[in-house]
Every structure is written in structure tokens, then in C-alpha cells.
Design a protein with these regions (language model features):
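General detector of folded, globular domains
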Residues: 33-36, 55, 69
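Intrinsic-disorder/low-complexity, polar/charged segments enriched in Ser/Thr/Lys/Arg/Asp/Glu/Gln
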Residues: 11-13, 42-46, 76-78
């Protein structure tokens, strides 16, 4: 488990690297969906991808997930997703 930022008081993050799946021509969305659906309230998902997953970001934001994106020196991207805290 990893954290997107040392000062962020966020859940622990499960890492899922989709680069090999994509390189093999496999659509990673079904596996991402399984992992997102299995998240506990105190967990988040960190996805490592070869490109910025803009459609996924928009989709999960529409499901009340917060997002943080970090470009990596090797050209890959780490995108963190976690459930937004309930209002109030």
C-alpha cells in the first residue's frame, strides 16, 4: 500500500499496474472496476498506466471519487482514486 502524498491524511492505497495488460492488448477496465468495487471506505486505488487515463478519471469522479495524478519520470502516470468524504 502506498500514499499519494506524505502529508495527506488519506486511506491506504492498493497499487494496480496496468501497463503490462495494455502492452498485451488487454482492456484493463474490467479489472480496474473489480478493484474499485472491492475498495473499503478506508482504502484507495493507485493505478499505474502508460498514459493519463482521462476517461477513467472522469468516470470515477462521476461516482464521487477524488483523484490525484502524478506524472512519473519514465513517462508513466500514477493516478490515485479514493472516495470523497461525505458532506457534513
Amino acid at each position: 500500500m502506498i500514499s499519494p502524498h506524505p502529508t495527506m491524511s488519506l486511506p491506504s492505497f492498493k497499487r494496480f499496474d496496468v501497463r503490462k495488460l495494455i502492452a498485451q492488448g488487454i482492456e484493463p477496465l474490467p479489472e480496474i472496476r473489480k478493484r474499485v468495487d472491492a475498495l473499503k471506505p478506508d482504502e484507495g486505488l493507485a493505478i499505474v498506466s502508460p498514459f493519463l487515463p482521462s476517461p477513467l478519471i472522469e468516470k470515477l469522479r462521476g461516482e464521487d471519487f477524488e483523484t490525484r495524478v502524478e506524472p512519473q519520470p519514465d513517462g508513466s502516470w500514477v493516478t490515485y482514486f479514493w472516495r470523497a468524504a461525505p458532506a457534513g
